[in-house]
Each structure stands twice: as structure tokens, then as C-alpha cells.
Amino acid sequence: MSDNTLVSDYGMCEEEQVARIAWFYYHDGLTQSEISERLGLTRLKVSRLLEKGHQSGIIRVQINSRFEGCLEYENALRNHFALQNIRVLPALPDADIGLRLGIGAAHMLMESLRPQQLLAVGFGEATMTTLKRLSGFISAQQIRLVTLSGGVGPYMTGIGQLDAACSVSIMPAPLRASSQEIACTLRNENSVRDVMLTAQAADAAIVGIGAINQKDQASILKSGYITQGEQLMIGRKGAVGDILGYFFDAHGEIIPDIKIHNELIGLKLNSLSTIPTVIGVAGGEQKAEAIIAAMRGNYINALVTDQKTAGKIIQLIEK
């Protein structure tokens, strides 16, 4: 007797079975075991018929929620860029996007970090907001922190909010040295090298993503690490964004022959590959191209962004 004829003591064809199973499962909230007992089928048969119902189109799930668009974007971006994790925050008018991104990233880290694990942190407003929101969790779970670059000042707005007992390794050097020679000397200092090696061994990392078209709103410019003239020149060379001060083009390739790259003290972007989870935190439609480039370059494998930015990213990759 085939699956498409009468297949049980109830005299139901397969399509009717699927319909009844779907109704019991989704409408009445019965478990697959309860359905199998009610219809005289094995639990495995119930599971297979549910799956067949989805594949055939008999079962269609509709989510009526303001989060539906976010979930669709998450699924599309996760599949397109092979992301480990992604969170798209729903659009809220007049909301502080930086604050919301920090909260979203903090939640992602709280779900993934285990007690006493090591978290590497890049500089930037979004990452520091994340640390503020994580402060209680960091203390309770004894999470250890390490900075990904030099520069004490850019980190203090976040690290300064932590309990004094928290374990924090800060790179004892500036983010950018005054020359390539001085940068090389500092990188070779044992105290600096030890922190860099510790950062490479982190269980997870969180980084901000800057966009060249942010102009005077870019964190690296506001912090005084590049001048407006340098920003213009870097943009003319094809840069669309940066992570940790390293600028890359739309394909995620590092822009060659840029002075700042030789003067930075911290992990290079290709060194992030040793860290299992690298979360990029960035929002605002002007950052869409930079976020795409960061994912194409495989510098991040997880993302926290907002709904409008995710929509812009989808629009750009579908062109």
C-alpha cells in the first residue's frame, strides 16, 4: 500500500495525514509523541510527514511580528556570508542606534561565552557600549579581557566601567606610533608581544567596523589617529572601511602602501582568523558597504546590525 493511498486504520490518504498532523502540532500544540498515539503512527512517521508537508507546500508557516523582517534578513545574510551568528535589530524611530547595537552585541556574547573564557576587544563606540552592558556578566562569569590594539584612551570608556577585580590585559603602547621604526620597536617589546599573543588566543572577539564615507564621524578620525587629509587619500585608493585601523576595499582586500598600516600597534586583520568567533558590531546605512567588505574579507564571522542597514546590505549584494 503506497503512501498516497489509505495508509492507516483511520483510512486517511497521506495529504490528509499531513493536514491533521500539522493542525495538531501547530494549532493544538500537541507533541509529536502525542500525535503518533492519536493517529496510530510511529513518531518517526509523524516527523517525516511534517517535513514532507513543509517541502510540498501543504504546511506554510507565517510569522506575524515586527521581527519577521529581521529574521528574514538574518537568514539571508547568514547563508550568503556563511556567518556563525547574526542579530538584526528591528528598526525603532528616534532610537540611539549605538546603544541598541551595544545591547544586541552584549546579548550575543552572553549567550556564547562560558565562565573564565577570554574576550578580545577592539576600540570604537559600539564595542565600548557593549562592554558597559556586559560589566555585570563579565564579573559574574569571570570573563577575562584583552585589547586587540594599542591605545589606552579609546578603551577606557568601556573598561573603566568594569569591576576593579576584572582581569584585563591592555596593550602597553599607543594605537599608532609616530613612525614605522618606532612601531616596529614597540611591537618587539616583550610586554606588547605578550598581550598580542594573548589576544590571538582569545575565545571570542568583538570589533567595530568603520566606513570611509562616515567622514568626520569616523571613530578613527574623531580619536585623532588619522587626519582628514589622510582619510581623503585613503578613500581615493579605494578603501571603503576599516577594522582596528586597517583599511580595506570593497572586496575585503587590505589597501597597500598606506602609511598608517606600518605605524599601527596591534593585531593585523589576518591574525583574527585564529579566534573562533569574531563579532562585527556596526549600524547605519552608510556602513553597509564596509560591513559587506568585512564579511567578504572573512575578518568577522558574526554580525550585529540594525534592520535598515541589513536591508541596504541585501540590496547591495543583489545588484
UniProtKB/Swiss-Prot annotation:
Superkingdom of the organism of origin: Bacteria
Localization per Swiss-Prot or TrEMBL: Cytoplasm
Regulation: Inactivated by phosphorylated autoinducer-2 (phospho-AI-2). Phospho-AI-2 acts by binding to LsrR, which is then unable to bind to the promoter regions, allowing the transcription of the target genes.
GO molecular function: carbohydrate binding; DNA binding
Keywords of this entry: Cytoplasm, DNA-binding, Repressor, Transcription, Transcription regulation
Residue spans crossing the bilayer: none
Record feature DNA-binding region, as residue ranges: 32-55
Keyword check for Repeat: no
Recorded GO CC terms: cytoplasm
First-listed, main subcellular location of the protein, grouped into a coarse class: cytoplasm
Family statement drawn from the similarity comment of this UniProt entry: Belongs to the SorC transcriptional regulatory family.
Role according to the record: Transcriptional regulator that represses the expression of the lsr operon in the absence of the quorum-sensing signaling molecule autoinducer 2 (AI-2). It also represses the expression of the lsrRK operon. Acts by binding to the intergenic region between the lsr operon and lsrR. In the presence of phosphorylated autoinducer-2 (phospho-AI-2), LsrR is inactivated, leading to the transcription of the genes.
Protein name as annotated: Transcriptional regulator LsrR
